[in-house]
């Protein structure tokens, strides 16, 4: 594996796409300081995955992108590509099969960094994996930059161990150990989290158990509280209805009293209206008299104002006449002055017009001469520009031909080198095995068919499993439902049986029965079976006889006369069977509704029930009671008894109430339990079958999935083998064809380049002669053009001066004309104003003659007499109005008193209405609450006892609420959460065990990796130490050196260098000179190379601190090691340059831009010498 070429674009100073070959084993890079040589080393380190900008001599990673120069803009991306010849297959991983490997990295300004391998997107990790164990990497010992030699020899022991590990090739072991430690760390963290969760879950389970108890108590309290609250609502609703009725009656009484008071008010209002009409009439008369007085006063005022106006008008007209005479004299004087100024202005305009005409003629003459001069100037300039363009074209042609010659030389050299490489590569190509490829394809087809079959079976199994799972869940749900149903029926049956048992064994009568040993006797009700619905009717008729005890002879009951039972008790003895009594008419007897198996018992019931008949309801019984025989009775389903002369309403008042109904229900429930048990057994059998089918399908799915995975893995493996061989065959065919075509193309290109170079030399000579002729002619034309340009400039200046003089003259003439027009307008205005003032003067004199005061004084005396008469009439009208106003005020006060008496009544009615409305709203509120709760009010009323008070119910609700509040926060989902938490704890316990096993497995793997790494490192240390001891004397001409381990454990111990040149006994290497340190570091690096030679090595001015003798020894050692390792070195030393097989020159002719140039070996040596 060797480096064959490097491509750079936009990386640091290599802004243009640059591609240079690395053909030999010793390639030197030369050039002046600062031209960008070290950027090549940075580029290689960068593309191998370097992520620290400081290692690339920058502050941020964007610094590797070209940042612009004085003539170029900054670049937007940087790209570096390394092309390796992998014909020996040394590359690691899947890329080892490729003969050529191209590693590429691209970085853009937005920070996006991309890696590619053979133009396929890859990760940074993938690129590093290729070079694991080869000594290559962003900071490996195979890339030695400026100052790195000193850092190696002066590195800390722990840092120096890193180079030893790279030489040993344990990078992959360390990577595996790091990944294993990461997984171990993650597993331990997961185990810790699981254990924390388990502990937390255990505490949570205890809380949930306590919460479940509280939730059950909470439900009981809530149910009791809801019942008490609804009873309270119903009681409040009834009280609100009663209060509403009381308030309605009070409102009616108050309304009657209000109507009486209102009638009195209407009488007072009628009297008030009569007085108000009279008052309106008197008020109108008074207002008429006052209006007449106002008119008389107005006439007096008008005449007085008229007299005052006449006097003021006479004075005003006299003043106006005097002012108009003065204005008339002023306008006449202004017209005379303007006429004199007009004559002077006309003379000035004539002079200005004459001067303007002369100046315009001079300016026109100068402008007419300019076009000819300008045309000559433009012709001369065009000719001069054409000459300049031809010179520039000729110079460009010369440069182009020179570049063509250099390019042709470079192309010829590169083509010849590539021709030789292609010949060598063609001879080393190996044809792939066709038979093996065909065999792999047949195996692949066979396994793909097997995979398709397995995938089909897997799809069928995956499709069937959800269906079976649904069937299984449905079966289990049915089992649960049937079990719940049977449990419910059994619980109901047990409750009824217990109730029946309690009825028999509890109460006042039982101790008496036990005392007389009668407790074992059968009760009557156990032998009776009544038609459904008539149980209560039979109980109402038989009453205490329903629990009668059967005895063989009634005579011995006489013994209980002295020791009577504490409650009613009946005995019966079955007589001889008799015929039942016939029912009169259409009456239905009760006895046929009772099913009795015992004939003797039937005779007893015939005696007790012979005259008892049934009716559907109480109304029917009452209607037909006269049809009853003597001593007969009707009984209805509700238990009410109707005789010919009375009605007995039934109520449960004994312990035996409802025993027949309960017995009937017990019998029905017993049958239902047996039927439900059969259904439950059937559901359990179906669930077992469904569970077995699901388990079988699940196992089959697991087996089919495993088969499909094995088939998939085998198919993938065969696909990779086929792909490798196919790609190898394609690469062989493609590369063979490509080499043949390239060789033909290169031969043609070589001939073409030679012909182009000869043609370029001829063109260069021709263009050189043309350039000399053009430059001579250009100098002559340049002088003639400068003279013409000066003449044209002077002519333009003189024309501009003449034009300015003409412009000034025209402006003076226009000013004179404007002055004349203005004076004419002033004269016309003065005449017009004088005429207008004369007309106004005539009008004012005529107005003065029309003014007369005597007529106005006579009219004023008459108006004063009329006003006095109007004042007397107004006084009489005002006296009449004041009298009516006093009467109207008295009547209005009476009306107000009546209205004030009405207001308390209205307030009382309003208050009563508010109370009635409040009662109605309260009732509606409680009715709405009952409706919202969907309460059956009829059933609720039966629970409402007469002695229940709202305070009692409110106290009960408060007590229950306090009990609920005392429970604190209640988790209603505690029961469900408890089941879920228990199930989760079982799962977490299993997961904790799995994680513990995984930790043990990972720890075993780490111990195995450490064991292998320790052995490999020890062997490497011994081997490097041996090579180091051999190479050090070769570079120094004697002396000794060795490596020392600073610790007992090689995995974490440091490495220290001990070096003593000939004749020195120094204790540490820090006492050596700079050159000695450099040689020591070089010996150490090359010792690592001999152990694990890297494909190539980059040296950046490593020989800088060495003198000529040491440089010679260094060069000899590098030359000897180049048999196994390719060296690319940067140097300014002539001795180092001489050992190179090829030289690559780096130049910076354009500031800030690096380019690659061909370098002659002798020129380079002379450059280094200078």
Curated annotation (Swiss-Prot):
CC per GO annotation: chromosome; cytoplasm
Keyword vocabulary terms for this entry: ATP-binding, Coiled coil, Cytoplasm, DNA-binding, Nucleotide-binding
Localization: Cytoplasm
Binding site for ATP: 32-39
One GO BP annotation of this record: chromosome segregation
Start and end residues of each SMC hinge domain: 520-623
InterPro entries (UniProt xref): P-loop_NTPase, RecF/RecN/SMC_N, SMC, SMC_hinge, SMC_hinge_sf, SMC_prok
Residue stretches in coiled coil: 169-215, 245-365, 401-508, 664-944, 983-1020
Entry keyword annotation includes Translocase: no
Single GO molecular function: ATP hydrolysis activity
Subunit organization: Homodimer.
Annotated domain remarks: Contains large globular domains required for ATP hydrolysis at each terminus and a third globular domain forming a flexible SMC hinge near the middle of the molecule. These domains are separated by coiled-coil structures.
Family per similarity comment: Belongs to the SMC family.
Function summary: Required for chromosome condensation and partitioning.
Protein name: Chromosome partition protein Smc
Organism per entry: Burkholderia pseudomallei (strain 1710b)
Gene name for this UniProt entry: smc
């Amino acid at each position: 594996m060797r480096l064959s070429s490097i491509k750079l674009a936009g990386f640091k100073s290599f802004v243009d796409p640059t591609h240079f070959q690395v053909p030999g084993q010793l390639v030197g890079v030369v050039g002046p300081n600062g031209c960008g040589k070290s950027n090549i080393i940075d580029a290689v380190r960068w593309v191998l995955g370097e992520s620290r900008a400081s290692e690339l001599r920058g502050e941020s990673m964007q610094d590797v992108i070209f940042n612009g120069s004085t003539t170029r803009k900054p670049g937007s991306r940087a790209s570096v590509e390394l092309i390796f010849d992998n014909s020996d297959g040394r590359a690691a991983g899947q890329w080892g099969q490729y003969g050529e490997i191209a590693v590429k990295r691209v970085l853009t300004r937005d920070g996006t960094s991309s890696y590619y391998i053979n133009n396929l997107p890859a990760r940074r990790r993938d690129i590093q994996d290729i070079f694991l164990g080869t000594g290559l990497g962003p900071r490996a010992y195979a890339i030695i930059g400026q100052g790195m030699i000193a850092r190696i020899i002066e590195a800390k022991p722990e840092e120096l161990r890193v180079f030893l590990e790279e030489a040993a090739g344990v990078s992959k072991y360390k990577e595996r150990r790091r990944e294993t430690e990461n997984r171990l760390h993650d597993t331990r963290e997961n185990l810790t989290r699981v254990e924390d969760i388990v502990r937390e879950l255990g505490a949570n389970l205890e809380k949930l158990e306590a919460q479940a108890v509280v939730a059950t108590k909470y439900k009981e309290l809530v149910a009791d509280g809801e019942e008490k609250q609804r009873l309270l609502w119903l009681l409040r609703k009834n009280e609100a209805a009663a209060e509403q009725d009381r308030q309605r009656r009070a409102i009616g009484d108050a309304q009657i009293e209000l109507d009486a008071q209102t009638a009195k008010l209407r009488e007072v209002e009628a009297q008030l209206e009569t007085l108000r009409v009279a008052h309106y009439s008197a008020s109108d008369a008074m207002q008429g008299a006052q209006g007449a007085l106002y008119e008389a006063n107005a006439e007096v005022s008008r005449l007085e104002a008229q007299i005052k106006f006449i006097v003021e008008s006479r004075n005003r007209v006299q003043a106006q006449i005097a002012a108009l005479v003065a204005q008339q004299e002023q306008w006449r004087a202004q017209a005379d002055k303007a006429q004199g100024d007009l004559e002077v202005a006309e003379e000035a305009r004539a002079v200005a017009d004459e001067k303007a005409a002369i100046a315009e003629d001079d300016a026109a003459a100068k402008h007419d001469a300019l076009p000819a001069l300008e045309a000559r100037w433009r012709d001369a300039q065009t000719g001069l520009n054409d000459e300049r363009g031809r010179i520039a074209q000729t110079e460009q042609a010369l440069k182009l031909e020179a570049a063509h010659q250099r390019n042709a030389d470079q192309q010829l050299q590169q083509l010849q080198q590539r021709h030789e490489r292609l010949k060598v590569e063609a001879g080393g190509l190996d044809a792939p095995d066709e038979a093996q490829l065909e065999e792999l394809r047949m195996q692949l087809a066979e396994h793909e068919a097997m995979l398709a079959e397995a995938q089909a079976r897997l799809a069928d199994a995956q499709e069937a499993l959800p269906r079976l799972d649904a069937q299984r869940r449905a079966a289990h749900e049915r089992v649960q439902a049937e079990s719940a149903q049977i449990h419910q029926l059994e619980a109901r049956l047990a409750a009824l049986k217990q109730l029946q048992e309690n009825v028999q064994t509890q109460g006042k009568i039982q101790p008496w029965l036990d005392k007389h040993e009668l407790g074992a006797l059968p009760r009557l009700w156990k032998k009776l079976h009544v038609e459904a619905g008539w149980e209560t009717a039979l109980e109402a008729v038989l009453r205490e006889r329903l629990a009668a005890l059967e005895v063989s002879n009634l005579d011995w009951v006489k013994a209980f006369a002295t020791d009577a039972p504490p409650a009613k008790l009946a005995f019966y003895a079955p007589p001889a069977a008799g015929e039942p009594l016939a029912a009169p008419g259409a009456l239905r007897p009760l006895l046929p509704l009772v099913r009795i198996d015992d004939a003797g018992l039937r005779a007893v019931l015939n005696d007790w029930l012979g005259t008892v008949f049934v009716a559907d309801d109480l109304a029917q019984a009452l209607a037909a009671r006269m049809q009853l025989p003597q001593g007969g009775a009707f009984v209805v389903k509700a238990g009410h008894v109707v005789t010919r002369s009375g009605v007995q309403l039934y109520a449960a008042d004994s312990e035996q109430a409802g025993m027949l109904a309960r017995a009937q229900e017990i019998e029905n429930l017993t049958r239902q339990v047996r039927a439900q048990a059969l259904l439950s057994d059937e559901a359990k059998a179906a669930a077992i079958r469904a569970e077995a089918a699901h388990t079988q399908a699940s196992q089959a799915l697991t087996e089919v999935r495993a088969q499909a995975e094995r088939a998939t893995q085998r198919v993938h493996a065969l696909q990779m083998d086929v792909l490798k061989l196919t790609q190898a065959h394609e690469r062989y065919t493609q590369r063979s064809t490509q080499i043949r075509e390239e060789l033909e193309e290169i031969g043609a290109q070589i001939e073409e380049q030679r012909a182009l170079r000869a043609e370029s030399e001829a063109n260069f000579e021709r263009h050189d002669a043309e350039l000399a002729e053009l430059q001579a002619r250009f100098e002559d034309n340049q002088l003639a053009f400068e003279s013409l340009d000066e003449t044209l400039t002077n002519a333009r200046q003189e024309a501009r001066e003449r034009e300015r003089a003409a412009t000034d003259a025209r402006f003076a003439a226009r000013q004179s004309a404007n002055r004349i027009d203005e004076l004419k307008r002033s004269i016309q205005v003065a005449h017009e104003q004088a005429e207008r003032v004369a007309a106004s003067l005539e009008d004012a004199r005529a107005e003065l003659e029309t003014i007369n005061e005597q007529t106005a004084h006579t009219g004023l005396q008459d108006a004063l007499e009329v006003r006095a008469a109007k004042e007397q009439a107004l006084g009489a009208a005002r006296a009449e109005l004041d009298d009516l106003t006093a009467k109207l005020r008295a009547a209005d006060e009476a009306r107000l008193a009546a209205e004030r008496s009405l207001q308390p009544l209205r307030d009382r009615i309003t208050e009563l209405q508010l109370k009635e409305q409040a009662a109605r709203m309260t009732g509606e509120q409680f009715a709405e609450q009952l409706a919202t709760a969907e309460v059956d009010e009829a059933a609720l009323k039966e629970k409402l006892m007469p002695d229940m008070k709202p305070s009692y119910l409110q106290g009960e609700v408060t007590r229950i609420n306090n009990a609920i509040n005392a429970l604190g926060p209640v988790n209603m989902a505690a029961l469900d959460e408890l089941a879920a938490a228990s199930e989760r704890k079982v799962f977490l316990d299993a997961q904790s065990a799995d994680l513990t096993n995984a930790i043990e497995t990972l720890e075993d793997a780490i111990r195995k990796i450490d064991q292998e790494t320790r052995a490999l490192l020890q062997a490497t240390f011994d081997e490097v130490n041996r090579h180091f001891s051999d190479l050090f004397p070769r570079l120094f001409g004697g002396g000794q050196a060795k490596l020392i381990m600073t610790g007992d454990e090689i995995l974490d111990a440091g490495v220290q260098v001990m070096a003593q040149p000939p004749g020195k006994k120094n204790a540490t290497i820090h006492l050596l000179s700079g050159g000695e340190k450099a040689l020591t570091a070089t010996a150490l690096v090359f010792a690592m190379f001999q152990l694990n030679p890297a494909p190539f090595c980059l040296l950046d001015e490593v020989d800088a601190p060495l003198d000529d003798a040491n440089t010679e020894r260094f060069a000899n050692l590098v030359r000897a090691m180049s048999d196994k390792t390719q060296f690319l070195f940067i140097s300014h030393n002539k001795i180092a340059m001489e050992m190179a097989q090829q030289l690559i020159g780096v130049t910076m002719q354009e500031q800030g831009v690096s380019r690659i140039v061909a370098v002659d070996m002798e020129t380079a040596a002379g450059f280094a010498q200078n």
